[in-house]
Amino acid sequence: MTNPKKIEMVNDFQQQFAKKMNELGFTYSNIDLYQQAFSHSSFINDFNMDRLAHNERLEFLGDAVLELTVSRYLFDKHPDLPEGNLTKMRATIVCEPSLVIFANKIELNQLILLGKGEEKTGGRTRPSLVSDAFEAFVGALYLDQGLDVVWQFAEKVIFPYVEDDELVGVVDFKTQFQEYVHSQNRGDVTYRLIKEEGPAHHRLFTSEVILENEAVATGQGKTKKESEQKAAESAYSKLKSNNNL
């Protein structure tokens, strides 16, 4: 038997999503894709839905689509910049704090389907959750409308911020740490997930950053990417203060 609360939430989402897409000037075909894009695992768990009905797979796809789209934009806009500079700029644009800025600009967080507990604990404004939903939406848009429409979306929501230099204060610690290590003529930097714990709707990830085959710092976060950023921030701070790991 279908849960009345679930029906109410889904119907409300579909109405609000249609309104949002109209505001943005885009059409869509497969509403199920977008519903999945905005379905947090806590919502799926609350209503005992298929365990893969949440947005994490679309987030994975959207992450890659965003990187490609931003890479093409930077490649065309800066024909004289070397690869290293382009990589740094891309990292700043697609990192979590920037994605939250883009998502908040168009209030995408209001569309996210959350479980009761996640809603009560402020999940709707949690940066990692909002950035994940933004990536998942991009993944759904790509599958539903294609790369050209993703580009048009980026022209409205992402590129204006880049062109106005509004992301100057955004820090991508992985890039910052990598650059500092390179300036010190140190070895390769890699990241490894060492722990994943907690219920599906409230996971906690722990990652470590490895420099020259030695683990030098760890970080925790609600997502793997967030834990890597925290590890990089810790390692960078340690390296800067000691100038020797």
Swiss-Prot record:
PROSITE patterns, sorted: DS_RBD (PS50137), RNASE_3_1 (PS00517), RNASE_3_2 (PS50142)
Subunit structure and binding partners: Homodimer.
Keywords tagged on the record: Cytoplasm, Endonuclease, Hydrolase, Magnesium, Metal-binding, mRNA processing, Nuclease, RNA-binding, rRNA processing, rRNA-binding, tRNA processing
Entry-linked InterPro entries: dsRBD_dom, RNase_III, RNase_III_dom, RNase_III_sf
Function: Digests double-stranded RNA. Involved in the processing of primary rRNA transcript to yield the immediate precursors to the large and small rRNAs (23S and 16S). Processes some mRNAs, and tRNAs when they are encoded in the rRNA operon. Processes pre-crRNA and tracrRNA of type II CRISPR loci if present in the organism.
NCBIfam families referenced in this protein's UniProt entry, alphabetically: RNaseIII
Name this polypeptide is given: Ribonuclease 3
Catalytic activity field: Endonucleolytic cleavage to 5'-phosphomonoester
